[in-house]
Amino acid sequence: VLIAATSNVDDLARKRGLVPVHGADEHPQAVIQGYDPDIEWSRLEEAAFAVQAGARWYASNPDMTRPTDRGLVPGLGAQLAVVGACVDREPTMAGKPARPLLEATCTRLGCHRPIFVGDRLDTDILGARNAGITSLFVLTGAHGVHDLMDADPDRRPDHIGADLGALLEPPQRVVVGGDAARCDGQLVRQIDGDLEVDLTNHDMAAQLCGVRALLELVWTD
């Protein structure tokens, strides 16, 4: 196999009896791509050559971006796009939003009521839904409130939080009645096609409850 990922993936491949190679000229049967912040362009070229020659193509996830403390940087999805520009097919995904890695992780850990935390709707939340896992969307990465409002049904999280601290907080409870929704005292009403948000205060908890109530009115399909 030709591996376009970190050395850790090489080690894991060897443990499974696979033989990592470094170039398409070594006729790999498969290409495995995983996120590597230090990937060399030549490695992506070799991956493209191998896939063109008929090697099977696998990837861990399609995340286009990755959040850092300085902003977003290209993720594995961007590296996949480099190879994809040279071939006429898509890689087989092992990780989110596909089910295999999520299900394998739950089985290995013996999970009974897992919750998947993520900041991307198109991979994290979609992956959790595909695997039947409860999801918590956190506002610390690629997607935000506007993305939530436009989310398709299969990309809508079960819970919303500011960050991982939400795991230690009680879940938000929303009560919907007619054209209004209320969450922990925060009220959102639909008036003549417009949404009016009435917050009792403006701390993070209140704002999140306001967002949760708003989404109950927006997510009507």
Model-derived features: where do they sit?
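Asp-based, Mg2+/Mn2+-dependent phosphohydrolase catalytic module
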Residues: L2-D221
